[in-house]
Design a protein with these regions (language model features):
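Short aromatic/hydrophobic "clamp" motif used to bind/position activated sugar donors
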Residues: 90
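Glycine-rich, basic loop-to-helix element that forms the pyrophosphate-binding segment
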Residues: 68-85
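Acidic donor-binding segment of Leloir-type glycosyltransferases
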Residues: 26-66
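Acidic donor-binding loop at a coil-to-helix junction in glycosyltransferase catalytic cores
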Residues: 182-189
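Catalytic core of nucleotide-sugar-dependent glycosyltransferases
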Residues: 206-213, 219-246
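A recurrent flexible, glycine/aromatic-enriched loop bordering the glycosyltransferase active site
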Residues: 146-165
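Conserved donor NDP-sugar-binding/catalytic core segment of glycosyltransferases
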Residues: 104-136
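Short, well-formed alpha-helical segments that are part of the catalytic scaffolds
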Residues: 14-27
């Protein structure tokens, strides 16, 4: 399927979120220029998820759905979807997050108009209470911390965060998401790209909602110790790379 943007989504334990997620994604202003690649990761809710997805496929031929018999982990799912698709641009979409209807269009437009930029990202609302409509969010919602791109800022925070849009050729230059980490491989990949010369740019508008899911891979309190270890390891790895660069 010849589409400009590949939307990659790992589907696991999505009974609560899958229908509203699909309503949100298919309402994107440029959805007709996208392929939504859903990969079922041996989900306990597979039967329900499949029924809902098949329903949406009846009206959207650009929804692709495949199912794995074993969950290989989030980032291996992403890699499989990236390697199994051809779109020039890629974005990830989490089933419990939500996008402003112009989100993908705004990110795509930036990348198409600025050839020197490799990754586009935006400002997001964040809450521990779930929201389905980004365009009608309560004004008291917090903003997820982000900043204009710099190597220094990226070295201290995963700036692209939960739904950036990036050029496929980054994977040709820098490889894929590492299976070394459970929740930090996206940050490690962006650092790998940036230290290799890739450029990123912030869209300084709220174009999404990030759900601080109490059962999420990176937000479940039970995973906090592991997450801290991963963050420290990634930070120290690229701090050393930065020192070597400046020294050289």
């Amino acid at each position: 399927m010849d589409k400009q943007v590949e939307i990659i989504t790992s589907v696991y334990a999505g009974r609560r979120f899958i229908r509203k997620f699909l309503e949100n994604i298919t309402a994107q202003t440029v959805f007709d220029r996208c392929e939504l690649f859903l990969l079922g990761a041996n989900s306990p809710d597979e039967e329900y998820e499949s029924a809902v997805i098949r329903e949406f496929q009846q009206n959207h031929e650009n929804i692709r759905y495949e199912i794995l018999t074993k969950d290989p982990g989030l980032y291996n799912c992403w890699n499989l979807m990236i390697q199994g698709s051809e779109s020039e641009f890629i974005t990830n979409a989490n089933i419990d997050d939500r996008l402003h209807r112009e989100s993908i269009e705004r990110h795509l437009s930036l990348l198409q108009n600025e050839a020197s930029i490799d990754v586009a990202y935006c400002v997001n609302y964040v809450s521990e209470s779930h929201v389905d409509d980004v365009e009608d969010c309560p004004v008291e919602l917090d903003l997820f911390p982000t900043a204009e791109f710099s190597l220094h800022a990226l070295s201290h925070s995963n700036l692209p965060h939960n739904h950036p849009v990036w050029r496929r050729n980054l994977h040709e230059k820098f490889g894929y998401f590492s299976s070394e980490f459970v929740s930090g491989s996206d940050w490690e990949f962006w650092l790998r790209c940036a230290y290799g010369g890739a450029k990123m740019k912030l869209i300084n508008d709220v174009l999404g909602f990030y759900y601080k899911n109490p059962k999420g891979i990176s937000t479940d309190p039970e995973n906090m110790s592991r997450n801290i270890i991963e963050v420290r390891e990634i930070y120290e790895r690229y701090r050393k790379i930065a020192k070597d660069m400046w020294r050289g």
